């Protein structure tokens, strides 16, 4: 199966500037393709997982993935589908975030000097040195303001009479210039992104084609939500991060273990590397035993992101907690100062401090709603004082919020 055929088969395809021509070229030769990532956090989350799997698929087919970190464009902010302007990041924040993003990506793709090895570039390398007058003279005439105003990302802001700064308006020009620069210096012929980036991608392809005459393409993926309409990557407890310093492998496993029944076959197709035969068996399993299918999905995706050992550990921890009622040290751990526990802390404050409630009032609601347990015993008094007498073996206290969120408090 070719790259494009597998791309479509896995459910990644939404739109392409010239699908037939791109299919032919990717069969005949190896290309370089790029995807850009925002520099807004020290890790990517599962909202970017489809794009990451596409980079991985590119590499598996012998094509060269180029990862662009928007160090330059992050200083401006992309207005795409945003109701408000983004916070502008400092150079120090961008550098720190870029390091974390490369860590996320390195779990899935190989960086290096080989022909199909991925490279990571920061568009600040070429955007920071742009002379504004030279840019207007050399490239300004290729952009149509009439066309830019019709793009949904701009049009919606204007229709709602929301502020759209000239700073943000320039983002489209700079992203288009990225494609031209990568085509010229890295022989990049394909830009990939979410469907919300279609207008920006087409502008870049058009600019490159007009100036260089090269065959370049843009291709987008559908914007994913869960079956209930929730945005991928976000939960009530926060983002589902890929880096283990922000989210433990166990919590990553639990996210997929607890996904909605209607999503698991689609997620297996999008995010796992099960063969077609294995996917067929998985679909049959999901129809017969949804919980076993969810365990398999969680295991496969945790193995891909964190390692087979991490997946095994997460599975064993889940079994001990949910099926055997034991305490497992692989649960997420929160450290509490010994003096705090010696003095005593109220139950609702402990749940808030441990991160199982976003506020003290939320912690009170959790306890009043019979959703809080300490050492597997229901907490009925939100003001109950928790002290060192609650410590179990190995100096831990087990906290549970609902049936699926568990952590250990260690002193």
From Swiss-Prot:
Reactions catalysed: tRNA(Tyr) + L-tyrosine + ATP = L-tyrosyl-tRNA(Tyr) + AMP + diphosphate + H(+)
InterPro entries: aa-tRNA-synth_Ic, Rossmann-like_a/b/a_fold, S4_RNA-bd, S4_RNA-bd_sf, Tyr-tRNA-ligase, Tyr-tRNA-ligase_bac-type, Tyr-tRNA-ligase_bac_1
Motif ('KMSKS' region): 231-235
Binding site for ATP: 234
Locations listed in the record: Cytoplasm
Sequence motif 'HIGH' region, residues: 39-48
Entry's Gene Ontology molecular function annotations: ATP binding; RNA binding; tyrosine-tRNA ligase activity
Pfam family, one: tRNA-synt_1b
Enzyme Commission number: 6.1.1.1
GO terms of biological process kind: tyrosyl-tRNA aminoacylation
GO cellular component, one term: cytosol
Keywords, comma-separated and alphabetical: Aminoacyl-tRNA synthetase, ATP-binding, Cytoplasm, Ligase, Nucleotide-binding, Protein biosynthesis, RNA-binding
Top-level division of the source organism's lineage: Bacteria
Positions contributing to L-tyrosine binding: 34, 171, 175
Residue span, S4 RNA-binding domain: 345-411
Classification via PANTHER family: TYROSINE--TRNA LIGASE, MITOCHONDRIAL, TYROSYL-TRNA SYNTHETASE
Similarity field: Belongs to the class-I aminoacyl-tRNA synthetase family. TyrS type 1 subfamily.
Subunit field text: Homodimer.
Protein task: Catalyzes the attachment of tyrosine to tRNA(Tyr) in a two-step reaction: tyrosine is first activated by ATP to form Tyr-AMP and then transferred to the acceptor end of tRNA(Tyr).
Protein name stated in the entry: Tyrosine--tRNA ligase
Gene: tyrS
């Amino acid at each position: 199966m070719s790259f494009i055929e597998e791309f479509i088969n896995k459910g990644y395809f939404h739109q392409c500037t010239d699908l037939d021509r791109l299919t032919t070229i990717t069969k005949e030769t190896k290309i370089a393709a790029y995807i850009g990532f925002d520099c807004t956090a020290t890790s990517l989350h599962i909202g970017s997982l489809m794009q990451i799997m596409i980079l991985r698929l590119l590499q598996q087919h012998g094509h060269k993935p180029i990862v662009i970190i928007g160090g330059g464009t992050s200083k401006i902010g992309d207005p795409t589908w945003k109701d408000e302007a983004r916070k502008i990041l400092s150079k120090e924040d961008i550098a720190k975030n870029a390091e974390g993003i490369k860590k996320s990506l390195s779990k899935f793709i190989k960086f290096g000097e080989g022909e199909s090895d991925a490279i990571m570039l920061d568009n600040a390398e070429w955007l920071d040195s742009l002379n504004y007058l030279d840019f207007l003279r050399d490239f300004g005439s290729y952009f149509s303001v009439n066309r830019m105003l019709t793009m949904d990302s701009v049009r919606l802001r204007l229709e709602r009479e929301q502020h759209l700064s000239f700073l943000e308006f320039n983002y489209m020009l700079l992203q288009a210039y990225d494609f031209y620069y990568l085509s010229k210096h890295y022989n990049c012929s394909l830009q990939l992104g979410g469907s919300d980036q279609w207008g920006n991608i087409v502008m870049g392809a058009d600019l490159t084609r007009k100036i260089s005459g090269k065959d370049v393409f843009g291709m987008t993926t559908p914007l994913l939500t869960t079956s209930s309409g929730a945005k991928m990557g976000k939960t009530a407890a926060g983002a589902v991060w890929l880096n283990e310093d922000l989210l433990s492998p166990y919590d990553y496993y639990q996210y997929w273990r607890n996904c909605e029944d209607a999503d698991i076959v689609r997620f297996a197709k999008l995010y796992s590397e099960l063969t077609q035969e294995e996917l067929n068996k998985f679909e049959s399993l999901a129809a017969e035993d949804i919980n076993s299918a969810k365990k398999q999905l969680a295991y496969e995706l945790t193995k891909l992101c964190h390692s087979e050992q991490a997946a095994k550990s997460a599975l064993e921890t889940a079994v001990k907690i949910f099926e055997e009622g034991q305490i497992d040290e692989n649960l997420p751990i929160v450290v509490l100062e010994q003096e705090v526990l010696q003095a005593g802390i109220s139950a609702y404050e402990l749940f808030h401090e441990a991160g199982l409630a976003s506020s003290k009032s939320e912690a009170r609601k959790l306890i009043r709603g019979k959703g809080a347990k300490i050492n597997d015993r229901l907490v009925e008094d939100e003001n109950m004082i928790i002290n060192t007498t609650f410590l179990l073996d190995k100096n831990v206290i087990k906290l549970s919020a609902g049936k699926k969120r568990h952590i250990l408090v260690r002193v």
